[in-house]
Amino acid sequence: MSQNTLFDKVWDLHKVSSLPGGSDQIFIGLHLIHEVTSPQAFGALKDKNLKVKFPSRTVATVDHIVPTDNQSRPFKDNLAEQMIETLENNCLQHKIKFFNIGSGNQGIVHVVAPELGLTQPGMTIACGDSHTSTHGAFGSIAFGIGTSQVRDVLATQTIAMNKLKVRQIWCENNLSNGVYAKDLVLHIINELGVKAGVGFAYEFAGPAIDELSMEERMTICNMSIEGGARCGYINPDEKTFSYIKNRLYAPKHTQWDKALLWWKSLKSDENSIYDDVIKLDASKVEPTVTWGITPGQSLGINQLIPLLDDLPPNDQFIAEEAFEYMGFMPGQSIKDTPVDVCFIGSCTNGRISDLRVAAKILKDKKVSKKVKAFVVPGSEKVATEAKEEGLDKIFKDSGFQWREPGCSMCLAMNSDKLIGNQVSASSSNRNFKGRQGSPSGRTLLMSPAMVAAAAINGKVSDVREFINK
């Protein structure tokens, strides 16, 4: 009887050959590219007079450096204009499908691919971006790769990789009201550590995961990399299939029936052998906020920032660094910390369900006068849906700026940046030093609902106080 995990099955299906040194050559079913990590890769192909091996398996959009305030061409930022123009030319030359600004389907690559039905169970997916693990929510095995590997995939449709170990993270019970997928994944990273996943694929499972919507599952898998894992995935189920059905690039008619039959076979066997199993109680997770300079430095809204002596020895040095940079003290409460900027968006939490949750909190309320707040839809499709539902009006009436799709303040490659020592309440995925554009800017990661609550009060707040009124 088979004892294979979904990861084992997908890996073996895509293994082309075993390579000297112990790595495998893996075929990539879908290659996603954007304007920042692809120019050098295309340049390398040109230098060697090579063509893209399978143009139909590569899909492009623009997201990282695009402005979100004014997307009229040419852009004010010459570098942004140059990078996007380069991608336009490369896609035209190599006959690659490209979703540009104004196409109706442009946006953050990890938002766009699932909503178009490009992301499907059993696939191997690669992209020159750390958060490619997002697509694992569909039962695919998805890796972030560097520019040299982007080149390799363009030229050969394969990459060389060592097979990962598999850790199952079993989430028992369900999340409480006012607690979201973002809280759960921050809690997981805090419990295991930011390096615990090195060499692993994370399989997220259990009642709490089953209960999540597909968009919430994407949030979980998106942040696998923040826990050190190369990828994260969830076994596909009826929610997965319902989400994909009738999307633009989903299989149609008899092809759908064939695909569905295969997808249903793609799950970890009941007696799968894992390299490690971790069990967590999701019902104990609170709304969670980061206090430090890694996503693992987080705590529940009613908890106190840890004392140095309460931390493992290996965590104490980075904690001291975080205290100095963030301006927090051991034993301090994170609740009521004043915030200057509130950001809702990113490939972690820029989907329509994220905007709906935040808008529900903001309806008939006003953003604190002390706060600059803006929302950046994850894609043009998300923006269109939000406008059809009147969400943009709720955001604007509350005092949020409504922006155009892009990565925005998640990594601050465009003009959306913190200034000086500003503190940001952010629904993004990384709180590293200087991540949001200012060398001394400070980032507090939290769910979109928590960002909305912080925007209203001008300080870190428990969103449950709004929900339970």
UniProtKB/Swiss-Prot annotation:
Gene3D superfamilies: Aconitase, domain 3
Annotated EC: 4.2.1.33
Segments of skewed composition (Polar residues): 424-441
Binding residues annotated for [4Fe-4S] cluster, in chain numbering: C347, C407, C410
Protein name per Swiss-Prot or TrEMBL: 3-isopropylmalate dehydratase large subunit
SS bond partners: none
Record pathway: Amino-acid biosynthesis; L-leucine biosynthesis; L-leucine from 3-methyl-2-oxobutanoate: step 2/4
Role: Catalyzes the isomerization between 2-isopropylmalate and 3-isopropylmalate, via the formation of 2-isopropylmaleate.
SUBUNIT field: Heterodimer of LeuC and LeuD.
Highest taxon of the lineage: Bacteria
Pfam families, sorted: Aconitase
Top-level EC class: lyase
Region annotated Disordered, chain positions: 424-443
Recorded family membership: Belongs to the aconitase/IPM isomerase family. LeuC type 1 subfamily.
Cofactor: how bound: Binds 1 [4Fe-4S] cluster per subunit.
Cofactor: [4Fe-4S] cluster
Gene Ontology terms describing biological process: L-leucine biosynthetic process
Known catalytic reactions: (2R,3S)-3-isopropylmalate = (2S)-2-isopropylmalate
InterPro entries linked to this entry: 3-IsopropMal_deHydase_lsu (IPR004430), Acnase/IPM_dHydase_lsu_aba_1/3 (IPR015931), Acoase/IPM_deHydtase_lsu_aba (IPR001030), Aconitase_4Fe-4S_BS (IPR018136), Aconitase_4Fe-4S_dom (IPR036008), IPM_dehydratase_rel_enz (IPR050067), IPMI_cat (IPR033941)
Keyword Phosphoprotein recorded: no
Keywords: 4Fe-4S, Amino-acid biosynthesis, Branched-chain amino acid biosynthesis, Iron, Iron-sulfur, Leucine biosynthesis, Lyase, Metal-binding
